[in-house]
């Protein structure tokens, strides 16, 4: 009878231990299940965040995965990396999306990222153009035109080609048009962006635009005509004739034996398709000319 009385407390203690262990196991299992649910939910959330173009949030979500990693995690990481890169090099992002396709389940996120990259590329292309980086601007605007981003891309591309030094004959070949048709394209752009300055930055385009007779209200005139392989300019805007060849660079008309030693005489500014503002370098006198 005494042994039986001693066994009951021992059994009770073991039951408590067993219950404690069971509870700990259940809590651990619940924690594991919670982590699993958290990890599994992270991947769809990454795609949602990329669709919203929130690359930083997508990166944080992906880094928050603890134990249960999706088989496609490398693709999630690659897509997130591209999203993070969009603000710095949208061209590379678009190239990667085209060259290395993602699984079909990533379709919506890829489409959103592509559109975001195109938007970023337009801004980057314009910034490159304004900074004088014509090589990058040409590359970016060409891709935007290939993707039919918007109608303005073709206008920006034409200006980038002019700024890059394309001759009128090269531009005509690129567009499959005559040089007169290319000039009409450029003239139709005025005053879009810096089109007036772009035309004057390219000697061939400037000469083509200035060709013809221009007159002022007080009877002054300037005439540019094609002469053989070059051009000839006649004007009474100067007090006296200066001997030598004429050169036209960045809107400045100079005359001399060669370009390095040529004397700057007139500075041109395109007001619109039929109006020029001409400034004499010697005294700053301005004259407005209209196309006759």
PLM regions: where:
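N-terminal Sec-pathway targeting helices
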Residues: 7-26
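Alpha-helical repeat scaffolds
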Residues: 58-65, 89-100, 136-142, 167-182, ...
């Amino acid at each position: 009878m005494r042994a039986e009385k001693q066994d009951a407390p021992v059994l009770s203690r073991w039951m408590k231990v067993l219950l404690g262990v069971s509870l700990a196991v259940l809590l651990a299992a619940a924690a594991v299940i919670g982590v699993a649910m958290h990890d599994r939910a992270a991947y769809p959330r990454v795609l949602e965040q990329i669709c919203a173009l929130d690359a930083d949030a997508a990166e944080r979500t992906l880094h928050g995965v603890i134990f249960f990693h999706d088989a496609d995690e490398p693709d999630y990481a690659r897509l997130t990396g591209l999203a993070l890169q969009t603000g710095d090099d949208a061209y590379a992002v678009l190239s990667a999306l085209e060259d290395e396709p993602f699984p079909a389940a990533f379709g919506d996120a890829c489409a959103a990222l592509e559109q975001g990259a195109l938007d970023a590329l337009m801004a980057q292309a314009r910034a490159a153009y304004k900074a004088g980086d014509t090589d990058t601007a040409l590359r970016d605007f060409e891709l935007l035109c290939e993707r039919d981003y918007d109608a303005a891309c073709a206008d920006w591309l034409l200006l980038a080609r002019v700024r890059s030094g394309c001759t009128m004959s090269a531009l005509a070949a690129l567009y499959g048009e005559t040089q007169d048709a290319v000039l009409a394209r450029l003239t139709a752009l005025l005053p879009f962006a810096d089109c007036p300055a772009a035309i004057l930055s390219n000697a061939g385009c400037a000469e083509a635009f200035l060709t013809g007779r221009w007159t002022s209200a007080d009877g002054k005139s300037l005439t540019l005509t094609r002469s053989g392989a070059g051009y000839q300019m006649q004007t009474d805007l100067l007090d006296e004739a200066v001997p030598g060849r004429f050169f036209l660079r960045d809107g400045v008309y100079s005359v001399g034996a060669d370009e390095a030693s040529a004397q700057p005489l007139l500075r041109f500014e395109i007001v619109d398709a039929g109006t020029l503002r001409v400034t004499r370098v010697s005294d700053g006198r301005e004259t407005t000319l209209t196309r006759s």
